[in-house]
C-alpha cells in the first residue's frame, strides 16, 4: 500500500509518522510518501491533504500541476483524507465565516459545504472529545483555525458532530473512500481515525 501526503504546508510529516504507526497497527506493508509534483501521484493507493492554509495549498497544487490530475484520480476512485484545510480542499462548496462565498482552487469532490474559520482564529484553538461513527470510545479533536462542515448531500454524510456556541455542526464527513475532518487527528497520537480511513482504502 502506497499513501501520498500532499507536501506543501501543514502537518505533512505528522501524517507520515501517523501513517507508519497505522501500518504497523494494522499489520499492513505500507509506504508513506510526500507528494509535490504530478509524477509523485503515480502508483498511489490513497492521498492525504493535511492542514495549513487552504488557499495557499490550492494555489501551489494548481501552479505545480498537481490539482487537476489529483482531482481526476479522486473522481476515478482514489481514496482521499483531508484534515482541516484538507477538508476545505475536498469540499464542493466553501464559504468564509466573515466574508462569505470564497473563490479558491479546490478539488471539489465531496458533496459537503464547509465554512472556513468557523471556530475562530489561532487564539481560539481548542480541543474537544468527539463521538465518531465507526470508532469505539471518544476521540480527542484538536481544532486550530478549523472549518465546520455545515451541510452534506448524499452520498456524503456527516459522521461526527460538535455543539459549539449553541449550534450543532459537523466536524467529520465521509463519501465512499473520502474522509474529511475539521480537526487535526495527526496531532493526537491516536491512530484510530487513520485506521478507519485505511480500511476504506483497502476495500
Curated annotation (Swiss-Prot):
Record function comment: Catalyzes the hydrolysis of glutamine to glutamate and ammonia as part of the biosynthesis of pyridoxal 5'-phosphate. The resulting ammonia molecule is channeled to the active site of PdxS.
Catalytic activity line of the entry: aldehydo-D-ribose 5-phosphate + D-glyceraldehyde 3-phosphate + L-glutamine = pyridoxal 5'-phosphate + L-glutamate + phosphate + 3 H2O + H(+); L-glutamine + H2O = L-glutamate + NH4(+)
Name of the protein described by the UniProt record: Pyridoxal 5'-phosphate synthase subunit PdxT
Similarity annotation: Belongs to the glutaminase PdxT/SNO family.
This protein's GO CC annotations: cytosol; glutaminase complex
Metabolic or biological pathway, per its Swiss-Prot or TrEMBL entry: Cofactor biosynthesis; pyridoxal 5'-phosphate biosynthesis
One of the GO biological process terms: pyridoxal phosphate biosynthetic process
Active site: 84 (nucleophile), 184 (charge relay system), 186 (charge relay system)
GO molecular function list: glutaminase activity; pyridoxal 5'-phosphate synthase (glutamine hydrolysing) activity
Statement: the UniProt record of this protein carries the keyword ATP-binding: no
Alphabetically ordered keywords of this record: Glutamine amidotransferase, Hydrolase, Lyase, Pyridoxal phosphate
Gene3D superfamilies in the record: 3.40.50.880
Binding residues annotated for L-glutamine, in chain numbering: 52-54, 116, 144-145
Alphabetical list of InterPro entries matching this protein: Class_I_gatase-like, PdxT/SNO, PdxT/SNO_CS
E.C. code: 4.3.3.6, 3.5.1.2
Pfam families: SNO
Organism: Aeropyrum pernix (strain ATCC 700893 / DSM 11879 / JCM 9820 / NBRC 100138 / K1)
Complexes and interactors: In the presence of PdxS, forms a dodecamer of heterodimers. Only shows activity in the heterodimer.
